[in-house]
Amino acid sequence: MTQTLDAPGAVIAYDLREPAEPATTTPLMLIGSPMDASGFVTLAGHFTDRRVITYDPRGTGRSTRTDSEPESSPEQHADDVRRVIEASGGGPVDLFASSGGAVNALALVAAHPALVHTLVAHEPPTVRLLPDAGTAEDAVRGIRALYDRFGTGPAMVKFIEIVSFQGPIPPGFADEPGADPATFGLPSTDDGSRDDALLGQNLLTCCLFEPDFEALKYAATRIVVGVGAESTDELAHRAGRAVAAHLGVEPTVFPSNHSGFLGGEYGQHGDPIPFAAKLREILD
C-alpha cells in the first residue's frame, strides 16, 4: 500500500507491506539515498513475517520536491524518515539503511533515538572520517565540480571510479581523465540539467556529513555497522569501519558487496539470500 505525506519542501511517498499473518515482531524499515523504494523489493521479500516500510527520499522516485533548494541534507532526510515512521504507526522500528541512507539514519538516531530499536547502518560513505579524509573530500568536491561544469556523464564516470577504488584516494583523483561515459552507458553530451538526485542533490551533503557520535553513543538504539565481505578497501567499506571505530563497536561483515541485497534491481545482482539471512540473524 502506497501513501504520501507532506513535509517541508517535499511530498514523500512511502509503502507499507503487511505480513500474511498478524506480526508480533518490530516493523522493519528499509532505506537508501538516493536509492528509492524500488531498490528494496528483493530484500523486503525476505521479511514477509514483518510489516516492512520503504520510502522514496525527497527528490527521487515518487517523492517530489516542492521547494527550489538545490540540495538535501541528512538532517532533512532524517526528518522525512521520522515523519514516515510516525505516519506508519509510530516507532520503534528496526531500520536497515544502505549507503547514503545509512548516513541519514545516523542523523535520525542522533535526533530521535526512541524511534529506532536497532539500526543496521551498511557502508555509510562518511569520507571525513577516513585517514585520507583530505584527498577523499577533494575528490568528492571535484566530482561535484565536474557535474556543475560538464553534466552527468563525466561526473558519474568519476563517481563510479571513486566508489570502486581500493585504498586511500590519491591527490588529484577527480582531475585525472575519466573513461568515455559511453563505456558505462552514460550520456556523452550535457543536457543542461543540474538536478540529479545523486550528483546534484546529495553528493556533498551526504559524503561530507559528520555524525554526532556523542548523541549516538548515549542513544538507547542498538547500532550495528555493516560492511561488505567483497568491498574491502573501497571507500564506503572503509568509511563504515571508521564509523564503527568512532562508536567503539566492531563492524559486522555482510555477504557480497556495497549492493549485496540487490536481486536484479537496476540490473545489479548481489547475494541477497545470505545477505537477508545475515540481517535476520542480527535483528532476531
Positions of predicted regions on the chain:
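Structural beta-sheet core signal
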Residues: 30, 95, 225-227
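Short beta-to-alpha linker loops that shape the active-site pocket of alpha/beta-hydrolase fold enzymes
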Residues: 56-60, 125, 257
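Conserved hydrolase catalytic core segment
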Residues: 91-130
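Alpha/beta-hydrolase
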Residues: 135-142, 146-250
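Catalytic active-site module of serine/aspartate enzymes centered on a nucleophile-bearing elbow/loop
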Residues: 247-284
